[in-house]
Amino acid sequence: MFLKLTLPPGLFRNGTAYQSAGRWYDANLVRFFEGQIRPMKGWDTGLTGTLSGTPRAAHAWKDNEGDSFAAFGTVTSLYAHDGTTLDDITPAAAVSILLEDGTDLDTEGSEALLQESGFDSGADSSTWTLDNFGELLVACNDHEQTIYEWQPRGGLDATAITNAPDAKAIFVTNERFIIALGADGDPRRVAWNDQENRTVWTATSTNQAGDLNLQTAGVAMCGGKVRSGGLIWTDTDLHLMRYQGFPDIYGIERVGNNCGIIGRHAFYIVDSVAYWMGQNGFWRYVGYVEPLACEISDDVFRNMNTTYRNKVWCQH
């Protein structure tokens, strides 16, 4: 006689296989839909062409004519895709990008060994942050640290934004400021340009450029926009950046402690709710920070190779 087994959706790995009796314990290439386990659909080629190096970031946006573009940052290059053609838009100047093994490669072919400290031992793997300022792509590599821009349809490579500071990461706010995190070599400095003027970064009494230092023991990692402002993650906590206008322009307050992010791409924002992977748990921001219950967290954090945690990617 056969008995029908009805197992709750999702995996349970917070304990041993014996402790997960009555639950799914292991799976691969499956999904849960309407409470039932289903196979993943097949893979389809998203674009033609070949990327040089492992992709570390992606961003999609539309230009002023409503046409879609996507950008991809790898450990060696920067690419743009217009729906048909994949273009290498890596800046023409020699761009040094630190690979995970510590080897520094530049576009002129020279090699050197660059010592940088990562989260643990060894070098922190190179990654990009990408956003759009209107129809312009804005890009920053956390090892090379120059802030670049790229004009769709321009036929040119990405170029450095004039007067912009060095940075570890960037994002664009709802008020159309480019935010530079870890600006000018200070891991806690947050700098922004004059509103709508991406080449003016020095504050005066007649513009809205400026900078602030995060009040934190951590270092700025990444940022993104929600309805209430811009969220800035460090490796120890979370901050909210609000537009105030003259004279301060922006104010920053800490909105979460001991909830720092594990990597620069370990978050996603949907409907102004932010979700992210922390150093030892999962979190979300809904106007306040709260932990997310996860039935596989023990397995994830126990077996993770933390040397490469900056490669963690969150997607929806």
Regions found by a protein language model. Give the residues of each.
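N-terminal beta-propeller domains
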Residues: 1-111, 167-239
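A short beta-strand motif characteristic of beta-propeller blades
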Residues: 43-49, 112-118, 156-162, 207-213, ...
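Repeated scaffold domains used in trafficking and secretory/extracellular systems
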Residues: 52-63, 95-109, 115-132, 163-175, ...
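Short glycine/acidic-enriched loop and turn motifs that connect beta-strands
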Residues: 77, 144-145, 184-186, 281-283
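Short loop/turn segments that connect beta-strands within beta-propeller blades
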Residues: 82-84, 151-154, 243-246, 288
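Beta-propeller fold detector
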Residues: 87-96, 158-163, 203-205, 250-255, ...
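Hydrophobic or amphipathic alpha-helical targeting/insertion segments
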Residues: 132-161
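Beta-sheet-dominated scaffold domains
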Residues: 216-316
